[in-house]
Amino acid sequence: MQPCFFRDGKFYKLLPELGTIEINGVKMHQTVQRMPQEDAENKVNTLGVRKGENVLDVCTGLGYSAIAAAERGAKVTTIEVDENVLELAKQTPTSKKLFENPLIKIIVGDALQEVNEFDDGEFDAVLHDPPRFSFAGELYSLVFYHELFRVLKKGGRLFHYTGKPGEKRGKGIRAGVARRLAEAGFNKIEWNEETLGFTAVK
């Protein structure tokens, strides 16, 4: 496979020098303030992943968050809906451990559906790093947040990346996200400026 291709109505391009990919011209990782791997490390640190924990990683991408969590000794289940993204990950040297670390289990499927298969309280922590709201609004829905709440153990932690889309135009999503997380049952919902996401606790 070439590092760029058109498939399933989308144009995919691997940008190895930046450690990211583009889908329809949109970069899937933070590349301005820091490189994607460092960004993933920061998210995992913010979540407080520890050795022996069971972690759910929603939206695998190139696998940096799953790798970072597994390298801390956590058992990671990671979900990716787009097989084309995983094919690009196999061509990315920095993603090699995603396919080699025995602590990582990859599920190919729609997270909205796959999360229903997990038991109540199955995970110690959830790292939810979805595409932009305009691309995958269902992963920002109250229905999905209810499921993330359900699969977390009591006292379990959530990190939810959102970024700050639309805020310059007065159409930000953060207030709505925080409100729906609270409606789903989460407590201690706090914004983390460094990682551009919310932390919350069950």
Listing of model-derived features with the role each one plays in the protein:
Residues 1-15:
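N-terminal auxiliary segments of SAM/dcSAM-dependent transferases
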Residues 34-53:
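Conserved alpha-helix/loop element of class I SAM-dependent methyltransferases that forms part
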Residues 62-74:
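Conserved SAM-binding loop of SAM-dependent methyltransferases across substrates and taxa
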Residues 81-119:
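S-adenosyl-L-methionine
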Residues 164-202:
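Class I S-adenosyl-L-methionine
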